[in-house]
From Swiss-Prot:
Membership in a protein family: Belongs to the glycosyl hydrolase 13 family.
Thylakoid among keywords: no
Oligomer status and interactors: Monomer.
EC number: 3.2.1.1
GO biological process terms, semicolon-separated: oligosaccharide catabolic process
Binding site for Ca(2+): 140, 203, 237
Name recorded for this polypeptide: Alpha-amylase
UniProt keywords, alphabetically: Calcium, Carbohydrate metabolism, Glycosidase, Hydrolase, Metal-binding, Signal
Annotated site, Transition state stabilizer, chain positions: 340
GO molecular function, one term: metal ion binding
Record's cofactor remark: Binds 1 Ca(2+) ion per subunit.
Signal peptide: 1-27
Cofactor: Ca(2+)
Length: 520
């Protein structure tokens, strides 16, 4: 079996519906050779919206399996797949909600999405394409409908009572969380419990060794099912991460979890969600392989939106140095927007050329780029959350596999925002993504190289070099709506331009509007 490229399956696991951990698991991957290479382009997919195999309107695991060839067909010579290396699958565990971030059974698949057999089949088919899958693992909280929480409500002497955090006479019930939210919630039995996000998601008590053991068992279970790693939801909030003591306890827990997972699979890939400033994020690299760079994502989108560089390369270099001080092997998790944010195409007011620029920047920076499903075809959407998670558009109209779990407000089809329409259009956003991913993968400098900012005499140009094993590529992005001329080193040849019109004569480089140029 070839070493898999990386797929991030964002299984934000809503907590296990069964009270036991004794679910037998067929081990899907056997005898994998260790590999240190965890670099790759990931695709974040919301299964419910992706592809419907059983015609009930909801996306499912069989549908995702059927459409793996859209993501990566396993043939490096074809041009019609995205050629991503990994899939991050959003939650697939049983849950009472549409998003499934409130788990009722950590050891199973939501029946709406399929079953464990479907999951294992997906893992095996991903293997065939050298694609890795990571699951979004939700360990901070369970659903309030989880059997553990229900048992805790019914019986104060239940062992599950101490799985959660309860108020006592000294508790300040008016305490607010880090974004001003209410964190103490009244249970049906009249008591108050702690929940960072809302009353339907009671936080687990990680001061309880039984909880830590339980969640380690959950991780081991899914590794045995064939998953290659985890996207760790709300990694900041296991303890109160905004406090020094809470942050320290968080890191100790993630060290414990990491050690247990690596014992099960030495190549496990762990990426965490710590939604905060780089200084808060950085210490978590002591425990994890990768963390999402929200600060850099904001700079990319705001710069492209404004049409002038707001310090993208400087920020990328600074966070790179900071993160490496905690983990020299860190892998930055870079992205434009995700399932909790307004879609990048809406942020860019539907401007396809700006969307191409944002993609080009993302796919030439250090780290593992994450593409949110639909980003590659220009899907739009603004909060509330349901509207940034609308059905993926395969067709201009209706067609086989098109999901319909909700009526789209933004992405209704018929306006060119579909795989069907953009595959036929040579200069489409989809084909731009296909091309830029391949350009990245063809040059080790862009995958593994260090970054250094290049000073240019134009705020409309984002410029940096990527260097690996003594070889460098200089990257220039014109993010304005006008052609730009900049001075560059006389040496070096133009090896790639995102579209025609770029020209290098000695030390003068002309870059058309919203275009990217590589010089080597």
């Amino acid at each position: 079996m070839k070493g898999k490229k990386w797929t991030a399956l964002a299984l934000t696991l809503p907590l296990a519906a069964s009270l036991s951990t004794g679910v037998d698991a067929e081990t899907v991957h056997k005898g994998k050779a260790p590999t240190a290479d965890k670099n790759g382009v990931f695709y974040e997919v919301y299964v419910n919206s992706f592809y419907d195999a059983n015609k009930d309107g909801h996306g499912d695991l069989k549908g995702l399996t059927q459409k793996l060839d859209y993501l990566n067909d396993g043939n490096s010579h074809t041009k019609n797949d995205l050629q991503v290396n990994g899939i991050w699958m959003m939650p697939v565990n049983p849950s009472p909600s549409y998003h499934k971030y409130d788990v009722t059974d950590y050891y199973n698949i939501d029946p709406q999405y399929g079953n464990l057999q479907d999951f294992r089949k997906l893992m095996k088919e991903a293997d065939k394409r050298d694609v890795k899958v990571i699951m979004d693992l939700v360990v901070n909280h369970t659903s309030s409908e989880h059997p553990w929480f229900q048992a805790a409500l019914k019986d104060k002497n239940s062992k599950y009572r101490d799985y959660y955090i309860w108020a006592d006479k000294n508790t300040d019930l008016n305490e607010k969380g880090s974004w001003g939210q209410q964190v103490w919630h009244k249970a049906p039995n009249g008591e108050y419990f702690y929940g960072t996000f809302w009353e339907g998601m009671p936080d687990l008590n990680y001061d309880n060794p039984e909880v830590r053991k339980e969640m380690i068992n959950v991780g081991k279970f899914w590794l045995k099912q064939g998953v290659d790693g985890f996207r760790l939801d709300a990694a900041l909030h296991i303890f109160k991460g905004q406090t020094p003591e809470g942050a320290k306890k968080n890191i100790l827990w993630w060290n414990e979890f990491r050690d247990a997972m690596k014992k099960e699979n030495p190549n496990v890939y762990l990426t965490g969600e710590v939604w905060d400033q780089p200084e808060v994020v950085a210490p978590y690299y002591q425990s994890l392989d990768s963390l999402f760079n929200f600060d850099l994502a904001g700079k990319i989108v705001s710069s492209v939106k404004a049409g002038n560089d707001q310090g993208i390369a400087t920020a990328a270099a600074a966070t790179d140095e900071l993160f490496k001080s905690y983990n020299p092997n860190k892998i930055d998790g870079i992205f434009l927007t995700n399932h909790d944010q307004n879609r990048v195409m809406s942020e860019l007011s539907g401007d396809v050329n700006k969307a191409k620029s944002a993609a080009s920047i993302l796919l030439t920076l250090p780290g593992n780029p994450y593409i949110y499903y639909g980003e590659e075809i220009g899907m739009t959407g603004e909060k509330p959350d349901e509207l940034i998670r609308e059905p993926f558009r395969w067709y201009e109209g209706n067609g086989i596999g098109q999901t319909s779990w909700e009526t789209p407000v933004y992405n209704k089809g018929g306006n060119g925002v579909s795989v069907e329409a953009q595959t036929k259009q040579k200069d489409s956003l989809l084909n731009h993504y296909r091309e830029m991913i391949r350009v990245r993968q063809q040059h080790e400098e862009l995958v593994k190289g260090t970054l250094q900012s290049i000073s240019v005499d134009s705020k409309e140009v984002v410029a940096y070099s990527r260097t690996y094993k003594g070889k460098s590529i200089s990257v220039y992005h014109n993010i304005s709506n006008q052609p730009v001329k900049v001075s560059v080193a006389a040496k070096g040849n133009l090896i790639f331009a995102s579209e025609k019109g770029a020209k290098k004569v000695k030390n003068q480089l002309v870059i058309p509007a919203n275009r990217t140029v590589l010089i080597k």
